[in-house]
Amino acid sequence: FTTNTFTDKEWGYGDESPKVFAPTAFDADQIVRTAEEAGMTGLILTCKHHDGFCLWPSKFTEHSVKNSPWRNGKDDVVREISNACKEYQIGFGIYLSPWDRNHAEYGRPAYLEYFRNQLHELTTEYGELFEVWFDGANGGDGYYGGANELRRIDRKTYYDWENTREIVRRNQPNAVMFSDAGPDVRWVGNE
C-alpha cells in the first residue's frame, strides 16, 4: 500500500509523484480489526518500500504522504495503523527498506544519516514495536533524485549494520529485527 497501489507497479522506480497517493477509503480501524478477528497477534506495516515513498510525514524527505492529496497531506498512515493496533491489542511492527530509489545520495556515505534518521523517527514516534523488518537491499536502477542510473552497494558493509541495529536496540529494546544481516531473524531464501 503505497504509490505503487496507484501506478500498478510491483516496485516503484522512485520517480512517482506523491500526488498519485490518493486513497479514498483508507480505514486503519477496519484493517486492524480484520487482522485481530482473523486471530493475528501482530501486524507489520511497510512504512517505506524501495521506491522511497514514506507512509508517514518524515521530516527528512518530500517523498511522503505530507505532499500527497490524501487528507490534504495532513495525516499519517503509520500513526493510524499504530493507534489501531493499540486499540485492538495486537503488536505493531514496521518494515523499512534500506534501499531508496528516490534519494539522490543512495549508494554514497551521506545516505546512511538519512536512513538512520528515518529509522529513528519510526522507532521513537509510534509506540512499542514488536518487530523491525529490514529488507534485503543491494541497490539497482533507480531515479535517485533525477540521476536515473544503476547503483550497487556492498550490502554487508554499506549499511554499517552494527551501528544501524543499535538504533533499534536503544529505542525498541524488545523488538525483534529481521534482515539479511540478522541478528535476530534472517531471510532463508524462500521468498
Where are these regions (language model features)?
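Mature catalytic domains of secreted/periplasmic carbohydrate-active enzymes
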Residues: 1-191
